[in-house]
Amino acid sequence: MYRMQLLSCIALSLALITNSAPTSSSTKKTQLQLEHLLLDLQMLLNGINNYKNPKLTRMLTFKFYMPKKATELKHLQCLEEELKPLEEVLNLAQSKNFHLRDTRDIISNINVLVLELKGSETTFTCEYDDDTATIIEFLNGWITFCQSIISTLT
């Protein structure tokens, strides 16, 4: 219950810090969008890692594809391609004791942010790693990607 308020507080703090930094407006916008994407991914991961999640072991059986090397915003195309399977796994895991609030809204937010960040380029083809990832590895991988890109913008 308080987690959502804490994440909102962090998001607002990051927005204030970002807006006061002496960077170009497009860089500020990109950084802010990445920070929102990061928070959405962390919210999903926190919900999955919740100790009350009785379906975690089932969720871990589903596999996701990760890009071989994600270092640029265009690689977000790979995340976009895995959003539908991610949403389906999250919806399967819903139960009386475990419910990721607003899963559809979070996935929708992620999709909008990814589309804005990667731009309209649709010719990029993802090269996926040979090994698949669990849902936790998948989310952690994209969280690390966001943190890495944010660190290069500051």
Curated annotation (Swiss-Prot):
This chain's protein is named Interleukin-2
Its ancestry begins with:
Eukaryota, Metazoa, Chordata, Craniata, Vertebrata
The free-text function statement in the UniProt record for this protein reads: Cytokine produced by activated CD4-positive helper T-cells and to a lesser extend activated CD8-positive T-cells and natural killer (NK) cells that plays pivotal roles in the immune response and tolerance. Binds to a receptor complex composed of either the high-affinity trimeric IL-2R (IL2RA/CD25, IL2RB/CD122 and IL2RG/CD132) or the low-affinity dimeric IL-2R (IL2RB and IL2RG). Interaction with the receptor leads to oligomerization and conformation changes in the IL-2R subunits resulting in downstream signaling starting with phosphorylation of JAK1 and JAK3.
Q: Which residues form the signal peptide?
A: 1-20
Any GO CC annotation of this UniProt entry: extracellular space
Q: List the disulfide bonds.
A: 78-126
Glycosylation, residue list: 23
Entries under Pfam families matching the protein: IL2
Q: Which cell locations does it reside in?
A: Secreted
Q: Which PROSITE patterns match?
A: INTERLEUKIN_2
> What InterPro entries does the record point to?
4_helix_cytokine-like_core, IL-2, IL-2_CS
* Alphabetic keyword roster: Adaptive immunity, Cytokine, Disulfide bond, Glycoprotein, Growth factor, Immunity, Secreted, Signal
Protein family membership: Belongs to the IL-2 family.
Q: Which GO terms describe its biological process?
A: activated T cell proliferation; adaptive immune response; cell surface receptor signaling pathway via STAT; extrinsic apoptotic signaling pathway in absence of ligand; interleukin-2-mediated signaling pathway; leukocyte activation involved in immune response; negative regulation of B cell apoptotic process; negative regulation of inflammatory response
